[in-house]
From Swiss-Prot:
Record GO terms (molecular function): glucuronate isomerase activity
InterPro entries attached to this UniProt entry: Metal_Hydrolase, Uronate_isomerase
Gene: uxaC
Species per Swiss-Prot/TrEMBL record: Marinomonas sp. (strain MWYL1)
Designated name of the protein: Uronate isomerase
Enzyme Commission number: 5.3.1.12
Length: 468
């Protein structure tokens, strides 16, 4: 029997231990996709207590608490963070087998240095006092935690209409050496069927100083904002796609007619929705290619399943799940449209349902070339898949159907400043997997070769791929 979460946590072979401790552990973090608030980084937010920094916006924890029978008042309601923290302490011992149990204890270890203590109602008060005292120190501010965790850059998630004022402030602050770059998230500009699309056109038009009444106006507004993002260091776009649609682009007259119908709040056909979203995204993809940006496609989340809870507390609150619809055909059509004119940017494909893993891994192989290593990639296990089984399945698919050596590695996709330990979680699993290959004679015991591969996957590949 092994002790829980030692320094060799998840590492069962000597090769795995060497790969992790000698090559992976000290690599910097390039967190190229996250949902951190740039304002909180700019203002160097200080957190009052452990409940606030742990529970304020973490829908993973919220889902677990609800499943454990915690009432909503103690999850997202008006209870104090001390009360919510106590409810969380009751929940965590029930989470064994869920990655949250590992994440919780990793987050206590780093950055707080709390080891050899299991989080529970019995230990919660002492941990509360110890962590709260540390949170008052400069190294436990938002920026301080990032520096402790050896973060080199983060890519936040930003709407085309955002001012980027906080990114500008951070870039001009010579006292902070971590790059905080915006990432272009244009979902509201191409999801013509969504509630609020008309209002969003007004918001985008105001940001670009363009009155959007025709398709060409929308493109002009997006083009103007693309330049602003590029000037602020943007290197990546991210499209959140619940339903992957594709249709051949119609005439601009037809696109104008679709836009006019939507502005007049008339219903659109499924074909019109596909035509409009495809046209906008195809135009965007070509712009990314010109600028050298990376295009990330997150596909297959089924959002806001509980309409009752959506009305009560809004989206991104723990009521999303995997969809199971097929999307190989429309995805292929979309990528091929860009590739036909050699205007496909570097692209990372993510699926929420792991039934699509092998499809995406092989789809990526269709569109390599141009002298770019790993130009199109099957991205890291996303959301419900950033746990041991999910990450191993994703890594195995990449290794068997692509080149694991070119993989750009892990990202947090998180709203929490304590989530950087997910990079450690990923790195340990990666080294365990490769170490297992060596122990079974499936890979050579060449530590220099494997060590460089591990270093690349942990940090170097992302740095090169995104141009950081």
């Amino acid at each position: 029997m092994k002790n829980f979460m030692t320094e060799d946590f998840l590492l069962t072979t000597e090769t795995a231990k060497r790969l992790y401790h000698e090559y992976a552990a000290d690599q910097p973090i390039y967190d190229y996709h996250c949902h951190l608030s740039p304002q909180e980084i700019a203002e160097n937010r200080r957190f009052t207590d452990l409940g606030e920094i742990w529970l304020e916006g973490d829908h993973y924890k919220w889902r677990a608490m609800r499943t454990a029978g915690i009432e909503e008042r103690l999850v997202t309601g008006n209870a104090s963070f001390k009360e919510k923290y106590q409810a969380w302490a009751k929940t965590v011992p029930q989470c064994i087998g869920n990655p949250i149990y590992h994440w919780t204890h990793l987050e206590l270890r780093r950055p707080f240095g709390i080891t050899d203590v299991l989080f529970s109602p019995k230990t919660a008060d002492a941990i509360w006092d110890q962590c709260n005292e540390m949170l008052q120190q400069p190294e436990f501010s938002a920026r301080g935690i990032m520096q402790q965790m050896k973060v080199k850059m983060v890519g936040t998630t930003d709407d085309p209409a955002d001012s980027l004022e906080h990114h500008k402030f951070i870039a001009n602050d010579n006292s902070f050496d971590i790059a905080v770059t915006p990432s272009w998230r244009p979902d509201r500009a191409f999801k013509v069927d969504h509630v609020g699309f008309k209002d969003y056109l007004n918001k985008l038009g105001k940001a670009a100083d363009i009155n959007i009444t025709r398709f060409s106006d929308l493109i002009a507004a997006l083009a103007q904002r693309l330049e602003v993002f590029d000037a602020h260091g943007c290197r990546s776009a991210d499209h959140g796609i619940e339903i992957m649609r594709f249709a051949n682009e119609p005439s601009e007259t037809d696109l104008d007619a679709i836009l006019t119908k939507r502005i007049n709040e008339q219903a659109l056909t499924e074909l019109e929705i596909a035509q409009f979203s495809s046209a906008v995204q195809a135009w965007l993809g070509k712009q990314y290619a010109k600028k050298g940006w990376v295009m990330q496609l997150h596909i297959g989340a089924r959002r806001n399943n509980s309409s009752r809870m959506f009305k009560l507390i809004g989206g991104d609150s723990g009521f999303d799940s995997m969809d199971d619809r097929a999307f190989a055909e429309p995805l292929s059509g979309f990528l091929n449209t860009l590739d036909q004119s050699d205007e496909l940017p570097k692209t990372i494909l993510y699926c929420l349902n792991p039934m699509h893993n092998e499809m995406l891994a092989t789809m990526a192989g269709n569109f390599q070339g141009g002298g770019v290593a790993g130009k199109v990639q099957f991205g890291s296990g996303w959301w419900f898949n950033d746990q041991l089984d999910g990450m191993q399945r994703q890594l195995t698919s990449v290794a068997q159907m692509g080149l694991l050596s070119q993989f750009v590695g892990m990202l947090t996709d998180s709203r929490s400043f304590l989530s950087y330990t997910r990079h450690e979680y990923f790195r340990r699993l990666l080294c365990e997997m490769i170490g297992g290959w060596v122990e079974r004679g499936e890979a050579p015991a060449d530590m220099a070769l494997l060590g460089e591969m591990v270093k690349g996957i942990c940090a170097g590949n992302a740095k090169k791929y995104f141009g950081f």
